Amino acid sequence: ERSRGLGDVYKRQLQWGGMEMKDMLAPKPIELPADPGAESTSDLAAGIVAHPDSPLLWALLAEQELNQQEGSEPSAFITAYAYARTGYHRSLDRLRGNGWKGWGPVPFSHEPNQGVLRAIAALGHAAKAIGEDDEYDRIRQMLSDADPESVATLLD
């Protein structure tokens, strides 16, 4: 693997008045290691017991619950919201444990990042389902800040 220089990921490109600018203070994109539960997706409950720190497994469990409750009253989404909230917090732990400072790119194209971004998106869906529109908006902005293309993939 070649080393990354200032011309690569350490600079974020901005467009301003048709002129390209580099943000020298922007953090480098986070590329997480493999999710600890990535091999345990066939039995989510057992996988979570074995890997409670897995954002991917919590995201899958929240997505499963959201899909089962589709079309239901808002109160039916409380369990999905709880699963998604847990996945969200596990995601923040995982990001911070790998150098994330609370902002900066988290590319969806890097497969190990997808569990984290899916868990965050699941919280957005669950929040919207129970009428937490402000939280949904914050989650949407968080995903857009992490990877603008992930919004279309995960929320729209």
Summary of predicted features, one role per range:
Residues 100-108:
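Short linear capping/connector segments at secondary-structure termini
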